Amino acid sequence: MLKEVDILLIALTSPIKIGVYENSKLIESIESEEKSSDILPIIFKDLQEKYRLQKLFYANGPGSFMAIKVAYIFLKSLSILKNIPLFATDAFYFNKNGPIKAIGKLHFVKIASEIKTQKLETAPEVIFRLPDVLDYNEFSTEAAPLYMIGAVGQ
């Protein structure tokens, strides 16, 4: 019998990161420098052979919109085909609310619960981390990408 797990995907930057969680605790992590559109089907095929997927989680932005779209379409398709619930939260959950590069000197920042763009002369390198324990309360069933973020520079 396969172990029941939840899967978390962070595909905002390279490398993509995937966490396997049992009872909300990280039991396996996977990183890949490959393009998410190429590697996600391979990784998830392996995961489905090894585990019984219960829930899917991902970072729905801000970040590379193309990477977010690929992740969303892939996970949403898997969610529908396999009847696995899909949940999302913003990327700030995975980088301790640090600024996230947008374009030029503009960065996405989260102030209170609002995501805005802000010009920063210098910003720390963005490092997204898989949490050791997944806090399910931080995620929502509203899993669509964060398209409501205004055009960069506005």
Residue ranges and their predicted role:
Residues 55-60, 66-86:
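DPxDG-like acidic metal-binding loop motif
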Residues 43-55:
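Phosphate/pyrophosphate-binding loops at sites that engage ATP/ADP/AMP, CoA/4′-phosphopantetheine
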Residues 4, 42, 58, 70-72, ...:
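Residue-level detector of functional hotspots within protein domains
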Residues 28-32, 60-65:
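A short glycine/serine-rich beta->alpha loop
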